[in-house]
Amino acid sequence: MTPSLKRLSGAMRARPAPALSGTIKAPGDKSISHRAFILGGLAKGVTEVTGLLESDDVINSGRAAAALGAKVEHLGPGHWRIDGCGGQWTTPSAPLDFGNAGTGVRLMMGAVAGTGTSADFIGDESLSSRPMRRVTDPLGEMGARFTTTGGRLPAHLDGGPLAGIHYTPPIASAQVKSAVLLAALGATGTTVVHEPQITRDHTETMLRAFGVTLTVERDGAAATVTLTGPQTLIACPVDVPGDPSSSAFAIVAALISPGSDITLEGVMDNPARTGLIETLKEMGADITLTPGPDMAGEKTMHIHVKHSQLHGITVPATRAPSMIDEYPVLCVAAAYADGITHMPGLEELRAKESDRLAGSAAMLRANGVPVEEGEDSLAVTGMGIGGVPGGGRTVTHHDHRLAMSGLVIGLGAKAASSVDDIAMIATSYPDFFDHIATLGGRLEPLT
């Protein structure tokens, strides 16, 4: 079922770029793509998906759905057909291997628990170091029986009946909320998830598209989601919109490269995902948004970006859930701003594919940018356009977003910058190299 993916590995260098220009179509959204495989695999009927992000992480979710009994077919670039199981997974013959996909494994834990199926969940070294109790604990309250390795992978799930719960996640996490809601589809009774701080709502939107009845009540920055089970998903077409998190790299590259003028087409426009654009505009970015067509129940936009003189700001901690994946590349923008950019409320970055808070600070220091690292904060002293020395090498710690950020910082620096490995970029954005090259960026493999 797997298409051929672009495979590049080893160190890479980014040279200072001339003005970036041109138009690219944003890559398919990773969050929507994961959910398309999981919901399509669980649904009754055939789900046809277009625009799917064919990255390593997403493909691992597709493989898991196939191992659980769904029929998954690749019809062409980004085009897939999923014949679902009608709410009845089959016990897989081998562990479900999610590689580096935290979203995939956490959501699938909920989806499998809700069907009463038993399964083993494994991942690579990076994923196996990430916390899973944030998902297994609430699923356990519903009746799922997990055995984990110190709260991490490998994990075993013994299938059994579930009951609805009222749950307030201790952290703002769309993955936790989604795992509970997916389990609630097969649970008896009503499940209520109360979010003190609203997170991305793709699961709620897509569940409705698949015929699920649920309610969402918002109260300021909080939200309460209510779902009564059991319910069966009914297959529907999914046209995946562009990924705001992946689009961030080209946006920042254009902002820091004098004379640049680029457009990204078809990017998802969801308030729970647009925190970076809001932040960059507050920093002085020349960004124009034009409405695009609705896709997968989401609004989209075309983003026009021109090189800009940026200035430091304080990013509200309450904005972190809407841009948690974009902080490494925001650090790049902050490096080229005038003044200090303060970023509080970043404790969740410590538990990503790597310690992204420490990794982002190390990337900046390696390239001559002053930064203060707190327990849950960063303060970046910007050096202005053309003022970043560059010349450093970013240690990626197998983290795709650190790798891409470590390359973008070199596009506007005085000297070329490099990263120690690029192999993991395929987990989220296999077209990154082609897109940057199309816009005029200079990326060179190092031997």
Swiss-Prot record:
It catalyses: 3-phosphoshikimate + phosphoenolpyruvate = 5-O-(1-carboxyvinyl)-3-phosphoshikimate + phosphate. Its EC number is 2.5.1.19. Keywords: Amino-acid biosynthesis, Aromatic amino acid biosynthesis, Cytoplasm, Transferase. PROSITE patterns: EPSP_SYNTHASE_1. Coiled coil: none annotated. The keyword Metal-binding does not apply. One of its GO terms (molecular function) is 3-phosphoshikimate 1-carboxyvinyltransferase activity. Residues 1-22 are annotated as: Disordered. GO terms for cellular component: cytoplasm. Belongs to the EPSP synthase family. Catalyzes the transfer of the enolpyruvyl moiety of phosphoenolpyruvate (PEP) to the 5-hydroxyl of shikimate-3-phosphate (S3P) to produce enolpyruvyl shikimate-3-phosphate and inorganic phosphate. This is 3-phosphoshikimate 1-carboxyvinyltransferase. It comes from Maricaulis maris (strain MCS10) (Caulobacter maris). The gene is aroA.
